[in-house]
Curated annotation (Swiss-Prot):
Gene assigned in the entry: fabA
Family designation: Belongs to the thioester dehydratase family. FabA subfamily.
Name of the protein in question: 3-hydroxydecanoyl-[acyl-carrier-protein] dehydratase
Organism lineage: Bacteria, Pseudomonadati, Pseudomonadota, Gammaproteobacteria, Alteromonadales
Sequence intervals crossing the membrane: none
CDD domains: FabA
Amino acid sequence: MEKANSFTKEQLIACGQGELLGANSPKLPIDNMLMVDRIVRINEDGGAFGKGEIIAELDINPTLWFFDCHFKGDPVMPGCLGLDAMWQLVGFYLGWEGAQGKGRALGVGEVKFTGQVLPDAKKVTYKLNIKRKIHRKLVMGIADATMEVDGREIYSATDLKVGIFSDTSTF
């Protein structure tokens, strides 16, 4: 059976509930912490390193929850939410490949913010290039990523690391 190469918001929510990739697969956050509305492309052999890529989007509108509290009178999307979205997508990628367990962000090499997401923006686009995949006792994905707002690159991150764990009680 061929794997899907794109996903809707409803499917991503189902992933957060353990219904899309399996009950024991890594889950996406749900509700306000899900920072992705759709995955428009995911594959195992594309991207800058030929090891996989993910292109995903988030629709922006002035009613998004974070604009009311970050900051009063000066609304801007928190940079950490864009970074978290990148980790979310690396974890999703590992689950899409068949990894089982709980996903956890393990680190990032370098992060640069060169712009901001304001309430009048229309769309954020995440572009992830998978650099390395480890499928042994430890399952881990490493990726480089960028985030664009309305076609302009504003964030970049190198060496985003996500691990998949069967037991997180001692993590």
